[in-house]
Amino acid sequence: MTQGHKKIIAENRKARHDYFIEDTYEAGLVLKGTEVKSLRLGKANLKDAYAKITNGEVFVHQVHIGVYPFAYYDNHNPLRVRKLLLNKREIKKLYGKVNEKGYSLVPLRMYFINGKAKLTLAVAKGKRKYDKRESIRRREEKRDLDRQRKNYK
């Protein structure tokens, strides 16, 4: 990861519930001016977001960046497709992983580092319903153990 002050704008908490995270990458975003200003106000949502590789480039879809309230006619489309900036080597690696059955690219969080907007992209495999139940059961068991340890002392 890059050094510097990190200000988190948005986080996709549901992704860790719906997917097994295999690997993560940090990517830059190609944005318009009003999008950057909206991000500085914290108006972003990664809930239904996903990424696709098209013609050797990575694009992120369904990332909602709210309109900038002080821009008049020059505002952006909140759900427009945005290009991600990755190295050619990283794109080839991602392409190889995503072509395997069950893998997809999921954005985990969006943040600023040294004034530049970045996105953490994960190679993830979808969980089935019983996997989700299993992780919920493990979390509850861990919580019960922690509670018992606390009460024991």
Give short role names for the model-derived ranges.
Residues 26, 31, 46-48, 81, ...:
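Broad gene-expression machinery/nucleic-acid interaction feature
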